[in-house]
């Protein structure tokens, strides 16, 4: 057996994590940082283009088609014909080289796609300005060809989506949008603020018409009235957005894998790997390259740099879907927004950081537990891991702070008592955080802990005595020290592996400081979402036979 995986001949530098500095606890909130490249005044209304002028233009890897040889569509045709990768096999006793040449792209489809991309790329400036003006057009003017006011169609966002260009539009999960054009893979929609743009069609679903609308439409058709199609030549100009492929549907993940070795992406459509992280597997190619997602990044990576997670019976684990969350932070101070683009929060609230604008480093884009998104001051926040690991200081002062306890104790807050408990749990001796073996926590008194039972026994108990949403946590059969969360679900029970690493409980791409924290999170957030958008939660711990 080889000691190392097949590697690229090219040097692969190790990725190093950059450390971030956070402010120390202060008695009063620090001075708010100034927005850069954007003059935000109170009650100022901004259009879509102005809002994102200061945001970084993060290049998104262009996912390829299922045919692996068409992945590098951004290269010229001549480069595609000669493009190849060289893999080397390294072992302790010998070194062998193996060349893998990607197949030539089909000229009838791959060539056309590349040409379209190049052609549209040269017109970005003019098309971008046209898209900016499109946001202010009336609803009737933006209507799809041949549609009257009675034929309007709405779509509902299945996932959040951040626009990557001037012609795209942000999506917020469960929000309703007017459908303007669905003739391409990217649909043109309009939000409630009359802002329009292109969105990936697999991130939205059409809203079912009501019975009244259906009857009204039939009556309209019977009258024989027809609407002439709009033959405006400007509608024939294809947006640059339309030439690139759709981003992956988060529900289409076929499994997960753990990265064994660092890998630095060598091409724009590749995915860099960091040892020890978990990635979602979206697609597998028979040449050994898989397409995956890590955070906001999507791309191809060498499968032999990873280990796929499997059950004891060989079945791929179903993991909690990865969210586009860069970090979890805790508010050290309360903050009241001064304009529509900022997000208010209370001291102790927990926020999800979804973007760190490079051009405005003192402000983060965050989402609260109500799903609201906005800009927040960085120096008002602290990473959750650092917050939990900080010894509890000045307990009497915090206990006497009625405002802080009141806001945190509410259903919408972060939970003041919860923060104190988690912080105490995270305050472990230094020997444990240094990588030394630690003792398993005492879970005997937990209602959801069933100890060392097999998966078969677990399914028997869930199916015999449980209802949908009941769950239990058991010791992992295949990995000593790990756990499994088993959930009673319609049709077939779900099992989620919890990997324990450096005092952290990892499930999917999320990490928790305790199993209590994990259970608390997935009782409020879905632990699984299927392709139809149905969500599963940890509703209730499965009652034990003795009633404890």
Curated annotation (Swiss-Prot):
GO terms for biological process: axon guidance; myoblast fusion; negative regulation of insulin receptor signaling pathway. Residues 20-37, 123-135 have a biased composition (Low complexity). It is found in: Perikaryon; Cell projection, Axon; Cell projection, Growth cone. Pfam families: SH2, SH3_1. Residues 227-242 have a biased composition (Polar residues). Adapter protein that links cell surface receptor tyrosine phosphorylation to downstream signaling pathways and effectors, many of which are involved in regulation of the actin cytoskeleton. Recruited by Dscam1/Down syndrome cell adhesion molecule homolog and InR/insulin-like receptor. Recruits Pak to membranes, probably when dock/dreadlocks is associated with activated receptors. Required for guidance and targeting of photoreceptor (R cell) axon projections but not for axon outgrowth, differentiation or target induction in the developing eye. This is SH2/SH3 adapter protein dreadlocks.
């Amino acid at each position: 057996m080889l000691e190392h995986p097949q590697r690229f001949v090219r040097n692969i530098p190790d990725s190093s994590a950059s450390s971030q500095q956070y402010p120390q606890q202060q008695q009063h909130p620090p001075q708010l940082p100034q927005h850069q490249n954007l003059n935000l005044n109170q009650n100022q209304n901004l259009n879509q283009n102005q809002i994102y002028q200061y945001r970084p233009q993060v290049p998104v890897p262009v996912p390829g088609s299922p045919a692996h040889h068409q992945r590098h569509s951004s290269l010229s045709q001549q480069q595609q014909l000669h493009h190849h990768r060289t893999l080397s096999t390294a072992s302790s006793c010998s070194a062998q080289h193996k060349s893998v040449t990607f197949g030539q792209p089909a000229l009838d489809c791959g060539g056309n796609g590349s040409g379209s991309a190049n052609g549209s790329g040269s017109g970005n400036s003019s098309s971008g300005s046209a898209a900016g003006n499109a946001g202010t057009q009336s609803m009737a003017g933006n209507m799809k060809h041949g549609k009257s006011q009675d034929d309007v169609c709405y779509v509902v966002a299945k996932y959040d989506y951040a626009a990557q260009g001037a012609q795209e539009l942000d999506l917020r999960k469960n929000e309703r949008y007017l459908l303007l054009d669905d003739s391409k893979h990217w649909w043109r929609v309009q939000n409630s603020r009359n802002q329009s743009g292109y969105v990936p069609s697999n991130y939205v679903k059409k809203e079912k018409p009501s019975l009244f609308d259906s009857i009204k439409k039939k009556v309209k058709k019977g009258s024989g009235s027809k609407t002439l199609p709009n033959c405006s030549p400007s509608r024939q100009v294809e947006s640059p957005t339309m030439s690139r492929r759709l981003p992956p549907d988060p529900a289409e993940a076929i499994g997960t894998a753990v990265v064994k070795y660092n890998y630095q992406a060598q091409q724009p459509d590749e995915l860099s790997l960091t040892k020890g992280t978990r990635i979602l597997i979206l697609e597998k190619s028979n040449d050994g390259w898989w397409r995956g997602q890590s955070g906001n990044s999507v791309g191809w990576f060498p499968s032999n740099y990873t280990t796929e997670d499997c059950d004891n019976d060989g079945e791929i684990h179903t993991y909690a879907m990865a969210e586009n969350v860069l970090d979890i932070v805790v508010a050290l101070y309360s903050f009241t927004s001064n304009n529509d683009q900022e997000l208010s929060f209370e001291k102790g609230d927990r926020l999800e950081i979804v973007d760190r604008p490079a051009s405005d480093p003192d402000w983060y884009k965050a989402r609260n537990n109500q799903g609201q998104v906005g800009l927040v001051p960085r120096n008002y926040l602290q990473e959750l891991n650092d917050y939990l690991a900080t010894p509890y200081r000045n307990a009497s002062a915090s206990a006497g702070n009625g405002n802080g306890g009141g806001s945190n104790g509410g259903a919408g807050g972060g939970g003041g008592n919860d923060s104190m408990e988690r912080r105490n749990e995270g305050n472990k001796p230094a020997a444990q955080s240094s990588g030394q073996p630690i003792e398993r926590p005492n879970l005997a008194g937990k209602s959801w802990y069933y100890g060392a039972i097999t998966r078969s026994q677990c399914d028997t108990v869930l199916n015999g005595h449980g209802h949908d949403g009941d769950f239990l946590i058991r010791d992992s059969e295949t990995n000593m020290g790990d756990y499994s969360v088993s959930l009673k679900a319609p049709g077939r029970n779900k099992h989620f592996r919890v990997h324990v690493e450096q005092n952290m409980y990892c499930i999917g791409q999320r990490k928790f400081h305790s199993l209590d924290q994990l259970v608390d999170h997935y009782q409020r957030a879905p632990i699984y979402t299927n392709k139809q958008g149905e969500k599963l939660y940890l509703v209730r711990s499965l009652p034990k036979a003795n009633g404890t």
